A protein has these predicted regions:
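Intrinsically disordered, low-complexity regulatory segments
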Residues: 1-145, 173-176
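Prokaryote-biased recognition of long, low-complexity C-terminal linker/tail segments
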Residues: 142-177
Length: 177
């Protein structure tokens, strides 16, 4: 039987979504991010800070399950959360599974009700790439700031303390370090 695969972040949503949409739909979860920037080596500083994402080890089994479900489906709809992280997760799903960012439907809903889900399925959009780029920029900055400044804190400030210090893009200005 062919079906449309709806990919969400949380498996808790799947039962209700499948119930609302009926037998022509199957819902699966990514369980959040499936790729990451694990260290500074994943950022090409000489090439406009181009990131190279890696599969998250703990998600390899889920990636395999999603790959099979995508292959068995006749259509895929991305239904990750309506925020920067959700948009980035949807983009990673497209990248990992070779789905078109321009033609894979992106559905957005803010409540798990039949009306909201059906409305989202009937009015799909596409990935919001400016939001994806904003999330990637934040992630890259977090890595650069954290990896470059935290060791300085360890060396110069926390050497007499048993507590480790760290620096981040948001926490450093917020705490006036």
């Amino acid at each position: 039987m062919t079906y449309t695969l709806v990919i969400v972040e949380s498996p808790a949503k799947c039962g209700k979504i499948e119930g609302f949409l009926g037998p022509g739909y199957k819902c699966m979860a990514s369980y959040g991010h499936i790729q990451q920037l694990s260290n500074l080596k994943n950022i090409d500083m000489e090439n406009n800070f181009k990131p190279t994402f890696e599969h998250i080890d703990a998600k390899k089994m889920q990636i395999t399950k999603l790959r099979k479900a995508i292959a068995d489906s006749n259509n895929v709809m991305l239904a990750t959360d309506d925020d920067r992280e959700g948009e980035a997760i949807a983009w990673h799903i497209c990248e990992v599974f070779n789905l078109s960012i321009h033609h894979t439907p992106r559905i957005i809903f803010h409540e798990i009700t039949k009306d909201a889900i059906v409305r989202a399925v009937n009015t799909p959009t596409t990935l919001n790439m400016p939001i994806v780029h904003a999330q990637q920029s934040r992630q890259i900055l977090d890595l650069i700031v954290g990896y470059k400044i935290s060791p300085l804190l360890w060396k110069h400030i926390s050497r007499n303390s048993k507590k480790g210090l760290s620096a981040g893009r948001c926490q450093t200005p917020a705490l006036r370090l």
